[in-house]
A protein has these predicted regions:
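Short, low-complexity N-terminal tether/leader segments at secretion or assembly junctions of large
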Residues: 1-12, 91
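Surface-exposed ligand/attachment interfaces on beta-rich extracellular proteins
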Residues: 12-35
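Intrinsic-disorder/low-complexity, polar/charged segments enriched in Ser/Thr/Lys/Arg/Asp/Glu/Gln
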Residues: 24, 36-38, 71-73
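Short loop/turn positions at the edges of beta-strands in beta-sheet-rich folds
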Residues: 33, 45-47, 78-80
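Positively charged, low-complexity terminal tracts
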Residues: 10-12, 96-100
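Beta-sandwich interaction modules
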Residues: 67-81
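Noncatalytic modules at the cell exterior or secretory-pathway interfaces
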Residues: 37-39, 77-93
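Short, surface-exposed beta-strand/strand-loop-strand elements in extracellular ectodomains
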Residues: 42-62, 96-98
């Protein structure tokens, strides 16, 4: 039997707020941005194409990834934004990132 008590949690001191453009070739969404509590990834509502979100395996396999329609979002818990890749199904699209 364990008796655990949390006395304090430290909240991150910065907010991550980024909009990045992606084309039809997968790319890392941002480099060297530490994440503490996770991030929301949103396909910008004004996009005319769906986007795909995934890991580095999207570089070698174009069919991998989670599809987001314009306005859709997903919450991901990663330690750094350099673990998240994105691409547009067609043309260029914007991806919004919000987290801490």
């Amino acid at each position: 039997l364990f008796n655990t008590q949390v006395k304090q949690t430290k909240q991150p001191s910065t907010l991550i707020s980024i909009v990045t453009s992606v084309g039809s070739k997968a790319k890392v969404l941002s480099t060297n941005v530490d994440v503490h509590n996770g991030v929301y990834i949103q396909s910008h509502p004004s996009n005319s194409s769906n986007v795909m979100i995934g890991g580095a395996s999207m570089l070698s396999n174009t069919s991998l990834g989670h599809v987001l329609e314009p306005g859709d979002s997903v919450f991901l818990q990663v330690s750094n934004l350099n673990a998240i890749y994105g691409k547009s199904i067609s043309g260029n699209s914007n991806i919004s990132i919000l987290g801490s």
